[in-house]
């Protein structure tokens, strides 16, 4: 359960750093996979030992292809989460700034909002000259409190969305339900060949930066 006190400490920097490390790992794995494929193609001799060598190389290629796909998925899931955490950080800042600019409101550590309640009489509301100053002030304070509550709710809802989306993708990688049919021979193993609907500019930029020069060229000329 994500709480208000939790998200006040959220910061995307650690996830962004992890995404960059995973990008480097993907490049290394992809190179190893391509080297194994090249080694298999280079074996032209025949015989039992050569056949066994080819089988070993094919096995290594298959394993590295799977690793490339899984690391690519983990990388993009982490970048998506970092983007979401950045959203939450912005929403939390919006809440705290709103509370600071409305000094009658108190934003508590648990995300609840307090404000001074004023006793407003019927006379304050029905005076022939219009509602009294106390009545108007009380109404404005309550309106501001409700606005701050709404901002807190929005921040928490986004935090839950980010947390659940990242957890779902991690679970799929952990329990083996994540599937990817791409191989080292496709344009961008483990990654889509085009930016996906719903991606933020940050995700698109990271996806493009994650591609090797050969992958970029293959996508451009496709």
Where are these regions (language model features)?
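N-terminal secretion-targeting helices of virulence/extracellular proteins
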Residues: 1-190, 194-206
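Short, charge- and proline-biased low-complexity linear segments
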Residues: 35, 220-222
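Glycosyltransferase catalytic domains, chiefly GT-A lineage
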Residues: 207-211
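Residues that cap or delimit alpha-helices
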Residues: 11, 200, 212-215, 222
């Amino acid at each position: 359960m994500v709480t208000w006190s939790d998200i006040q400490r959220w910061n995307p920097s650690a996830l962004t750093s992890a995404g960059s490390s995973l990008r480097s790992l993907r490049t290394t794995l992809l190179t190893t996979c391509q080297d194994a494929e090249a080694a298999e193609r280079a074996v032209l001799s025949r015989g039992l030992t050569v056949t066994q060598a080819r089988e070993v190389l094919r096995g290594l290629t298959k394993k590295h292809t799977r690793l490339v796909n899984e690391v690519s998925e983990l990388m993009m899931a982490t970048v998506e989460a970092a983007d979401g955490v950045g959203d939450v950080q912005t929403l939390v800042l919006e809440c705290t700034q709103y509370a600071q600019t409305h000094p009658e409101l108190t934003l508590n550590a648990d995300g609840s909002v307090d404000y001074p309640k004023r006793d407003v009489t019927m006379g304050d509301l029905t005076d022939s000259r219009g509602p009294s100053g106390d009545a108007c002030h009380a109404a404005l304070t309550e309106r501001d409190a409700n606005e701050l509550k709404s901002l807190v709710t929005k921040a928490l809802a986004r935090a839950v969305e980010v947390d659940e989306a990242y957890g779902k993708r991690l679970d799929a990688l952990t329990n083996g339900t994540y599937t990817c049919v791409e191989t080292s021979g496709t344009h961008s193993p483990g990654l889509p060949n085009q930016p996906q609907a719903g991606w933020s500019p940050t995700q698109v930029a990271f996806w493009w930066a994650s591609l090797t020069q050969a992958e970029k060229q293959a996508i451009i000329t496709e």
